[in-house]
Amino acid sequence: MQEQYRPEDIESHVQRHWDEQKTFQVTEDAGKEKYYCLSMLPYPSGRLHMGHVRNYTIGDVISRYQRMLGKNVLQPIGWDAFGLPAEGAAVKNNTAPAPWTYANIDYMKNQLKLLGFGYDWSREIATCKPDYYRWEQWFFTKLYEKGLVYKKTSAVNWCPNDQTVLANEQVIDGCCWRCDSKVERKEIPQWFIKITDYADQLLNDLDRLEEWPEQVKTMQRNWIGRSEGVEITFHVADRDDTFAVYTTRPDTFMGVSYLAIAAAHPLAQQAATGNPALTQFIDECKNTKVAEADMATMEKKGMATGLYAIHPLNGERLPIWVANFVLMDYGTGAVMSVPAHDQRDWEFATRYDLPMKPVILTADGQAPDIRAAAMTDKGVLFNSGEFDGLDFSAAFDAVANRLIAAGVGERKVNYRLRDWGVSRQRYWGAPIPMMTLEDGSVIPTPEEQLPVILPEDVVMNGITSPIKADPSWAKTTVNGQPALRETDTFDTFMESSWYYARYTCPQFDQGMLDPQAANYWLPVDQYVGGIEHAIMHLMYFRFFHKLMRDAGLVDSDEPAKRLLCQGMVLADAFYYTGTNGERNWVSPVDVTVERDDKGRITQATDRDGRELVYAGMSKMSKSKNNGIDPQVMVERYGADTVRLFMMFASPAEMTLEWQESGVEGANRFLKRVWKLAFDHQQKGLASALDLTALNDDQKALRRDLHKTIAKVSDDIGRRQTFNTAIAAVMELMNKLTRAPQESEQDRALMQEALLAVVRMLYPFTPHVCFTLWRALGGAGDIDTAPWPVADDAAMVEDSKLIVVQVNGKVRGKITVAADASEEQVRALAAQEPLVAKYLDGVTVRKVIFVPGKLLNLVVG
């Protein structure tokens, strides 16, 4: 064992050993309890960032810990390899997406290995490979046959100059990111999967996910958005037309003062005939972004259609307006507006001077003042005819029943959740396996023609998808008949919705999944990933699992038992203002800072001596140039140090503030562990500890050791408070560093302690612990060593330190037998000189005794 800790020497050696021994390669073993630990697979962007390192370190710590408990642990890794960034990079670098992607995978795979993650590399998948997406295509055709897939027209972002569809992120201030043309909304046919058929299951089964963060479950509940309400039919005045609205507030029905419809509503189209102003407004609405975040903040605009609807209960004529905040894809494409009791309706009515009719009393029974804002609380009805005096619940039922009796109402359950649109008009994605025959009929690609392979040797012009630009690619035949392939590709969320299941049998070529392997490993025992995926990936992930269950591919109802959402990694951000007022962000590695006595940054300059503005801590990002390259840190300090800092600096679910001083601290700690082990080894390894011959100091140290084992086991396994587990080992190390090593018993105890410390640190810092385990004479390799078990007998305390108070003030401390009675403690306390002084000549009126902790004598 060398005297100095040199990670550059040991880490590559240990990693080579793992590779050669295939240490983390696993197979199904019915005789062992399985544990499947999975971190969300990365997009191969080119380089790992610190967010990746945090995510994968957490997963690796859990995996290694569970492995030491004797479980058969699967921890796989792969690449979410399709996606828009590859297309942009290909155009920029004059290449095709495939070679760019594969080069990135090779580079990032090497980075992952440098960090020492214990992956089963034999199961590595890349979602852009035909042997992966062929089964996704096959499954899609089966869903189509079951009636769970359909095609309909839907709005997309369209660049009229480039004649291409744009993703939302390619629309900047309403213009095309590439040519700056004004983007239009265009209706085109797209494929959808009926996730709404599973809305109730997805909602109800959230209650079964007891080990998922409540925040994620709440976000999914809100996204599914189940509501109970009434669908009401309105007749259009002076016409035969009717249209429907859905409301969750039938109690406000007598306060409706206008109706708002979507620009794409058939009534709007009819009203626009011969009305140029309305036609122009409808066209403007078509170019409105439809994301809910945009809808919430955009200016609410509208225009009267000139049409009126008849209120079905009181016969009032209600104006019908086209409004830019009503979407055809949501509900019925029409809403009833009650401006007195809905803030959005109030703002619209105020802008266009529409009437408002309050129908709900305030909590104190007064008519509401709606001059400044709507009164949105529920309450007792007034101004509502036969429904006056009813509270919300009674009014809901009464109004609903009245509408149903009149033949114009129906109770309905609605969902905010919409069917999943899986079509993308991009090239770098899995081709959708559908085809159109000469007679116009659409059929799924026959199984024998799967996979529909995406050509990889293409030329990117940055505008049109190569498979759309090449008419010959789409041409094919079915049973001798000419047919055209679908040229849209799948949303990349498709690939990431089932990859976890394919990891259980990545080489299986007889079907999508090998049922035996899938049902051995699934569900995932621990899933790790960011909370930003709560309502997209994690919803589709759950949905796909239920689809696979119903197809007989898996037995379980949910894909993952336990979910941990790690926090973001933050770093200092600095900038200077350019000549045009723009902010130029400077990397923290190029900044020199001065700090005050509390460690706060007071001044910052770059390498040119330019004074910088400190913008505080923010998420590491390219836009603020404040990312720290993990590879640089590994080269400087070693992978174990980086891993240890990542797990110690913050609770896993909280944001982590990157501080290089903290990294240096983690490195110093590992050097201390190394030095203590080196010093111990140089004196010769000790023989077995004689538990019958321990002195009091040795008993106390061994008690601390086994209490630490118990705490670290609980912190990692149950609580997942990894930072407190590391802190407990650090505290123990402080005691071990001060412990004597002269006698054989002292050294035998040190040997027991060091072997336990090395195992407790192994999940966090596996390379150094692998090396120290061998140096300390541990049996076999630490990769197969069992987790240390706390000795209950060692944790029993023979004595306790009791604080003695007189009238609530500390007057002494005494050591007593752990099971000493109140009388025994009082007798010993009375013999303590300082305590006796305060008891002299007074009467003890009350005794407060907390066994093992406190004796308080109240005197007077």
UniProtKB/Swiss-Prot annotation:
Q: Name one GO biological process term.
A: leucyl-tRNA aminoacylation
Regions annotated as coiled coil:
none
Gene from which the chain derives: leuS
Lineage summary: Bacteria, Pseudomonadati, Pseudomonadota, Gammaproteobacteria, Enterobacterales
Catalytic activity reported? tRNA(Leu) + L-leucine + ATP = L-leucyl-tRNA(Leu) + AMP + diphosphate
Cell compartments where the protein resides: Cytoplasm
InterPro entries in the cross-refs: aa-tRNA-synth_I_CS (IPR001412), aa-tRNA-synth_Ia (IPR002300), Leu-tRNA-ligase (IPR002302), Leu_tRNA-synth_edit (IPR025709), M/V/L/I-tRNA-synth_anticd-bd (IPR013155), Methionyl/Leucyl_tRNA_Synth (IPR015413), Rossmann-like_a/b/a_fold (IPR014729), tRNAsynth_Ia_anticodon-bd (IPR009080)
Q: Know the name of this protein?
A: Leucine--tRNA ligase
List where the motif 'KMSKS' region lies.
619-623
Give the binding site residues for ATP: K622
Report the source organism: Edwardsiella ictaluri (strain 93-146)
| Residue window of motif 'HIGH' region | 42-52
